[in-house]
From Swiss-Prot:
Binds 1 Ca(2+) ion per subunit. Gene3D superfamilies: Glycosidases, Golgi alpha-mannosidase II. Residues 1-21 form the signal peptide. The gene is amy. Its cofactor is Ca(2+). One of its GO terms (biological process) is carbohydrate metabolic process. This is Alpha-amylase. Keywords: Calcium, Carbohydrate metabolism, Glycosidase, Hydrolase, Metal-binding, Signal.
Length: 460
């Protein structure tokens, strides 16, 4: 959920509060297995997710799909209603328990693991009837929580320099759970164990910044599978406690600075600066970082690139998937002019690129780089080249090579690689490239295009 930036001026009385999405953490420090890319299908219903696992995510090589919060939530026409739970029943607008279970099973059959965006910092504001028929009022969620289960501070967070205020007061007026309390910890773990019983493979912990790290560690220790993938949304702020590094003991932490700086480099500076992108920039260790070009909050608040940046956005995703730092998320949502607008058709996706669904995970330039990443996993960066400005190229050992041209003119040159001699398919243009016995090839890249070769595709 949103730590600071809201999607709009929202009325508390109507429970109208937007919460920024939190990068989640993984117990494994990065997703386990050889496929570490997650497709974040934001506000897709579970029937649509299941179909996409079979038709696209599995064949493309995605390791994970992240689904939006499944718990019953407040009613309303905004996307952020999903982030205001009123019970832990799987009864949100995206599907019921049967649809959720079927989705998990279908994705597993396609070789794709399932991560759940999990809201455990707070419950809703306001009062009313939830999407699954449960009645609630703020601080009273029958059969689940009552007033003693919430933090004593019932005021909104006002001071991000004050750790206690950040972690014990209310995020945009939402009822803040006392996660230091035994019953609350037990109840949250019960919810997550229920999801594990349905086959989920991991969790993204929304608004983790607002939960003490020791509370999350305690909750995680109660899981039936304590090795579940675990990634946490902890937003770095200069001079602000808590710090992302406090949370790496339980899993991955999403590295917001990576996304912020990527926007600045691609729009104001030079791609040549990316030669040492990652830990040398002061970021978390690659083994504990979750990275992204944008997420559902940042695409709306302007702090990162988003789909409206067109080719610049595409190239940033190509770079992220080619560069060996962190575990990448590919944000895949829908068009919006109103940043609060809920998904088209209640989250049902009949087809990509229709009815406003952007399906970034399926854009050929992005989807093709998932296999590139899988093929080059563990290989170092080699053969770096740049023109001092916005054309760069680099290899991934003997397994792959990428060139990106963010200049306004065509770049034609001979590239030196560490690839074995032979023919390769440029998965960006779907054309064949021949590498000679010295590891060289010549290519012309038009403005705002890329080239990517890997040893998993030797023909087009």
């Amino acid at each position: 959920m949103a730590s600071r930036t809201l999607s709009g001026a929202l009325a508390l009385a109507a429970a109208a509060t937007a919460v920024l999405a939190a990068p989640a953490t993984v117990a494994h420090r990065s997703p386990p297995g050889t496929k570490d890319v997650t497709a974040v299908l934001f506000e897709w219903d579970y029937v649509s997710v299941a179909k996409e696992c079979t038709s696209t995510l599995g064949p493309a090589g995605y390791g994970y799909v992240q689904v939006s919060p499944p718990a019953e939530h407040i009613q309303g026409s905004q996307w952020w209603t999903s982030y205001q739970p009123v019970s832990y029943k799987i009864a949100g607008r995206l599907g019921d328990r049967a649809a959720f279970r079927s989705m998990v099973n279908t994705c597993h059959a396609a070789g794709v693991k399932v991560v759940v965006d999990t809201v455990i910092n707070h419950m809703s504001a306001g009062s009313g009837t939830g999407t699954g028929g449960s009645s609630y009022t703020k601080y009273d969620y029958p059969g689940l929580y009552s007033a003693p289960d919430f933090d004593d501070c019932t005021a909104e967070i006002t001071d991000y320099q004050d750790r206690w205020n950040v972690q014990h007061c209310e995020l945009v007026g939402l009822a803040d759970l006392d996660t230091g309390e035994e019953y609350v910890r037990q109840t949250i773990a019960g919810y997550m164990n229920d999801l594990l019983s349905l086959g989920v493979d991991g969790f993204r912990i929304d608004a983790a910044t607002h939960i003490p790290a020791e509370d999350l560690a305690n909750i995680k220790s109660r899981l039936s599978n304590p090795n579940a993938y675990w990634k946490q949304e902890v937003i770095y702020g200069a001079g602000e406690p808590p710090k992302p590094g406090e949370y790496t003991g339980t899993g991955d932490v999403q590295e917001f600075r990576y996304a912020y700086d990527l926007k600045r480099v691609f729009t104001q500076e030079h791609l040549a600066y990316l030669k040492n992108y990652g830990e040398d920039w002061g970021y978390l260790s690659s083994t504990t970082a979750g990275v992204f070009v944008d997420n559902h909050d940042t695409e709306r608040n302007g702090s990162t690139l988003n789909y409206k940046n067109d080719a610049t956005y595409t190239l940033a995703n190509v770079f992220m998937l080619a560069w060996p730092y962190g575990a990448p998320d590919i944000n895949s949502g829908y068009e919006w002019s109103d940043p609060d607008a809920r998904p088209p058709d209640g989250g049902h996706v009949d087809a990509c690129w229709q009815n406003g669904w952007k399906c970034q995970h399926k854009w050929p330039e992005i989807a093709s780089m998932v296999a590139f990443r899988n093929a080059t996993r563990g290989e170092p960066v080699t053969d770096w080249w740049d023109d001092g400005a916005d054309a760069i190229a680099f290899g991934r050992g003997s397994k792959g090579f990428v060139a990106i041209n963010h200049e306004s003119a065509t770049v034609q040159r001979t590239y030196q690689t560490s690839l074995p001699a032979g023919t390769y398919c440029d998965v960006q243009s779907n054309t064949t490239v021949t590498v000679d016995s010295a590891g060289r090839f010549t290519a012309a890249l038009g403005p705002d295009t890329a080239l990517a070769l890997h040893n998993g595709r030797t023909s087009c």
